[in-house]
Amino acid sequence: MNQNLHTLSDETVAIVLTKLEPISTFLKDENLFEIVINRPYQVMTEGVEGWKTIETPALSFNELMGIAKVVASYSKQNISEKNPILSATLPGNERIQIVIPPAVEKNTISMTIRKPSSRSFSLEDLANKGLFSVCEQVSFTPLNNYLSHLSELKHIDHDLVRAYAKKDFVFFLNQAVQCQKNILIAGKTGSGKTTLSKALIAKIPDDERIITIEDTPELVVPQPNYVSMIYSKDGQGLASVGPKELLESALRMRPDRILLQELRDGTAFYYIRNVNSGHPGSITTVHASTALAAFEQMTLLVKESEGGGDLERDDIRGLLISMIDIIIQCKRIEGKFKVTEIYYDPFKQRNIFGGN
């Protein structure tokens, strides 16, 4: 890197860290998940013991506006009355969402900081911590038909069906990744979707070339042959490229897998394009309340996108059912990440028993 650019980058980071000094204790606390500011002079944190409120005299409205401006500058974006919403990543890799007036009440500022896990857990680690202790199988086809109709499936699915039927979810998911099944991880914000996606990505063989597409750098890819591509959310940033442009570029980059980190807005349509382009093995996330509701949420997202607006809802849903192999529903229960449901229905996917 050019020495002047390196120095400029270091100076910008130093300015950001100085501005964040009033909340630095919370940023360093490994027991916290979220740090939120709803109004001046007050910080709320969420950890294993739930929410706590801390009065913070240093965080005046002007001081918070100063933080917003510095974070915008650091992330090569802009925040103003015309552009009152900012999504960025802090120097410590924390994700921050900032909303200023007039998008929030006058004299208030909203800041939501998502802290990344201080370490990456393997799938086995998560299972030993009780990740699957309350997990249920979810499907359209009755579960008691799975083993009795095994011969109607491709051989590659036989081990998966057996593991799924006996709730051996670690083996099931490990095999699913190895077999390049398309996996969708669903849940609300803070439910452990990213933690689980990191564990699954770690199971991808080292000889595969991986391209990730995100709006905020968050995924950890341990494989040596990978490229992390970043798009500008809402057209902000130095380069006004979106997921569509990055996907088109990724398809020319000799990928074995293309991983779109989170599906929302138009990215759901590009997810379909990605899978249909002959690049299975996707591992991605979406906000949904249940595993089956993820199909409806995805249908809605595709329908609302520019590319999917002319498609019929039933056609979109049918396409999603045929493409998505596995849906994992995540939830935080009493401060612990849990998988509450796993959808896997190769019979419905292949329309073996017919029906809608």
From Swiss-Prot:
Q: Name one GO cellular component term.
A: type IV secretion system complex
Q: Where in the cell is it found?
A: Cell inner membrane
One Pfam family it belongs to: T2SSE
Q: Which SUPFAM superfamilies does the annotation name? A: P-loop containing nucleoside triphosphate hydrolases (SSF52540)
**Any one of the GO BP annotations:** secretion by the type IV secretion system
Q: Which Gene3D superfamilies match?
A: 3.30.450.90, P-loop containing nucleotide triphosphate hydrolases
Mind listing the GO molecular function terms for this protein? Answer: ATP binding; ATP hydrolysis activity
Name where it mostly resides. membrane
Q: Does the keyword Iron-sulfur apply?
A: no
User: What does the entry list as the binding residues for ATP?
Assistant: G187, K188, T189, G190, S191, G192, K193, T194
Q: What keywords sit in the KW lines?
A: ATP-binding, Cell inner membrane, Cell membrane, Membrane, Nucleotide-binding, Transport, Virulence
Stimuli inducing this protein: During the interaction with the intracellular environment of host cells.
UniProt cross-references to InterPro entries, sorted A to Z: AAA+_ATPase (IPR003593), P-loop_NTPase (IPR027417), T2SS/T4SS_dom (IPR001482), T4SS_GSP_E_ATPase (IPR050921), VirB11 (IPR014155)
**Which purpose does this protein serve, as stated in its record?**
The type IV secretion system VirB/VirD4 is a major virulence determinant for subversion of human endothelial cell (HEC) function. VirB-dependent changes of HEC include massive cytoskeletal rearrangements, a pro-inflammatory activation by nuclear factor NF-kappa-B, inhibition of early and late events of apoptosis, leading to an increased cell survival, and, at high infection doses, a cytostatic or cytotoxic effect, which interferes with a potent VirB-independent mitogenic activity. These changes of HEC require the T4S coupling protein VirD4 and at least one of the effector proteins BepA-G.
Subunit structure, as described in the record: Interacts with VirB9.
Family membership: Belongs to the GSP E family.
**Protein name from the UniProt record:** Type IV secretion system protein VirB11
